[in-house]
Amino acid sequence: MNDRQAALDQALKQIEKQFGKGSIMKLGEHSDQNISTISSGSLALDIALGVGGYPRGRIIEVYGPESSGKTTVALHAIAEVQAQGGTAAFIDAEHALDPAYAKNLGVNIDELLLSQPDTGEQALEIAEALVRSGAVDMLVIDSVAALVPRAEIEGEMGDAHVGLQARLMSQALRKLSGAINKSKTIAIFINQIREKVGVMFGNPEITPGGRALKFYSTVRLEVRRAEQLKQGTDVMGNKTKIKVVKNKVAPPFRIAEVDIMYGEGISREGELVDMAAEVDVINKSGSWYSYKEERIGQGRENAKQYLKEHTDIRDEISKRVREEYEIDGASKEPLEETEETLSLLDDE
């Protein structure tokens, strides 16, 4: 047994000498076993994710039908990162980002890094450079479907380019995944959906870009509109369901229900009223909502308005709800400039 241990120790020393300290270790010796997270900007989604937000150093895929709220979900996460003093980048392959809407959601557009690349290769090379800098806390690519390979752009309409985009994504993710983990960057890939032709049974919906992103993603979120939110005859927004389809850091298949209001994004007050009522932090009797024996509104909309006007009570309720769900809040520390992250570019 001693000979085996001595041989193992010798092998470990050789590996560390060749590849550097920390290249191999026992899992229990790892200094950071707890998953570091950044809040998604939505209390309901933080709870559904199970760890209080998006895990750092991981790949997240957000997909769904058109106008379901995918970009809104990503912009809320960017606003949260910036509020904690972090740096965020947005690669707008669709060339459709609305700065005014982003500002309404709390994004500091003066500090947001924005790129509108011409080709898929250019977009992913920019993404790699940003990740390897070790100085970007969150990177959003909108969207995978719009990452058009250079050969397709330079070709003519009607030319067949079978599997080009899938190969591009597969190669890019092979290069990016290690750097994303080392730099602790959260990489959010927004994706669209397509339908397979001739599927008789089962779900015909697929996401573009091949299978690679499905495998590399730690979390996959499916965003879908459930119903319209109306005030009288006017449509004010949509009730949206965000389903955690895949989760490597907590149990999957949880669903977050949020109100996405036009021009405002996710209604924090709406989800707070629902989540607080679920765990009896807010009491619901008939149509009345009350907190600590004090009525805060008749009907959900009035309760939402009360919390919007009384931010101190809103924050107090939010804290209690997080405690009830054992979500202690995401990490408040921005990415530190460690020797490891700053030397990422030199590792190639």
Curated annotation (Swiss-Prot):
Stretches with biased composition (Acidic residues): 336-348
Lineage of the organism: Bacteria, Bacillati, Bacillota, Bacilli, Bacillales
Binding residues for ATP: 64-71
Segments of skewed composition (Basic and acidic residues): 325-335
BP GO annotations: DNA recombination; DNA repair; SOS response
Gene Ontology CC terms: cytosol
Region span, Disordered: 325-348
Protein location: Cytoplasm
Keywords, in A-Z order: ATP-binding, Cytoplasm, DNA damage, DNA recombination, DNA repair, DNA-binding, Nucleotide-binding, SOS response
SMART domains recorded: AAA (SM00382)
Family stated for the protein in its record: Belongs to the RecA family.
Main location per the UniProt record: cytoplasm
UniProt xrefs under NCBIfam families: tigrfam_recA
Highest rank taxon of the organism: Bacteria
Annotated InterPro entries: AAA+_ATPase (IPR003593), DNA_recomb/repair_RecA (IPR013765), DNA_recomb/repair_RecA_CS (IPR020584), P-loop_NTPase (IPR027417), RecA-like_C (IPR049261), RecA-like_N (IPR049428), RecA_ATP-bd (IPR020588), RecA_C_sf (IPR023400)
Single annotated GO MF: ATP-dependent DNA damage sensor activity
Name this protein carries in UniProt: Protein RecA
PROSITE patterns found in the cross-reference section: RECA_1 (PS00321), RECA_2 (PS50162), RECA_3 (PS50163)
Gene3D superfamilies noted in UniProt: P-loop containing nucleotide triphosphate hydrolases
Coiled-coil region(s): none
Originating species: Listeria seeligeri
Role this protein plays: Can catalyze the hydrolysis of ATP in the presence of single-stranded DNA, the ATP-dependent uptake of single-stranded DNA by duplex DNA, and the ATP-dependent hybridization of homologous single-stranded DNAs. It interacts with LexA causing its activation and leading to its autocatalytic cleavage.
Cysteines paired by S-S bonds: none
